[in-house]
């Protein structure tokens, strides 16, 4: 994916040195080299708090907690993005599989993959997303 850094489809500029300083090694490898964090190890796998999940690279709001569900796959799963404009999808033929890669539409950061085995009563989709690609902003509690 590092070859996509200067792709004009992604308006958010990325400086490699700045990203390496700002991101953890896992965040960098996941978002910039399409690595996958080990299952059941991500910070947000079991998070149930209300809020919004943002791209760790550029801050774009990607998923709402109301679209999150427990899939048992080991990564945070959502049945839809916050809107259709925040996600870029690309065919992925790596590792001997055919999958649909999911990227942030603003910066091109690798987020994970989308599969057609999500909740049938919703969209039927499962956005399987690396916690390392996300920052969570909790919804303020009402007093």
Curated annotation (Swiss-Prot):
Q: Which NCBIfam families match?
A: peptide-methionine (R)-S-oxide reductase MsrB
Domain of life of the organism in this record? Bacteria
Question: What GO terms fall under cellular component here?
Answer: cytoplasm
What Enzyme Commission number(s) apply to this enzyme?
A: 1.8.4.12
Q: Which GO terms describe its molecular function?
A: peptide-methionine (R)-S-oxide reductase activity; zinc ion binding
Q: Which residues bind Zn(2+)?
A: 55, 58, 104, 107
Gene3D superfamilies this protein is in?
Peptide methionine sulfoxide reductase
Catalytic activity reads: L-methionyl-[protein] + [thioredoxin]-disulfide + H2O = L-methionyl-(R)-S-oxide-[protein] + [thioredoxin]-dithiol
Kindly provide the name given to this protein in its UniProt entry: Peptide methionine sulfoxide reductase MsrB
- Which residues does the UniProt record annotate as the domain MsrB? 16-139
Q: Which family does it belong to?
A: Belongs to the MsrB Met sulfoxide reductase family.
Q: Which Pfam families match?
A: SelR (PF01641)
> Per its UniProt entry, what is the enzyme's top EC class, as one word?
oxidoreductase
Write down the required cofactor(s): Zn(2+)
Q: InterPro entries of this UniProt entry?
A: Met_Sox_Rdtase_MsrB, Met_Sox_Rdtase_MsrB_dom, Mss4-like_sf
Provide this UniProt record's keywords sorted from A to Z. Metal-binding, Oxidoreductase, Zinc
Q: Give the cofactor note text.
A: Binds 1 zinc ion per subunit. The zinc ion is important for the structural integrity of the protein.
GO aspect biological process, one term: protein repair
Tell me the active site: 128 (nucleophile)
Please tell me the species this chain comes from: Burkholderia mallei (strain ATCC 23344)
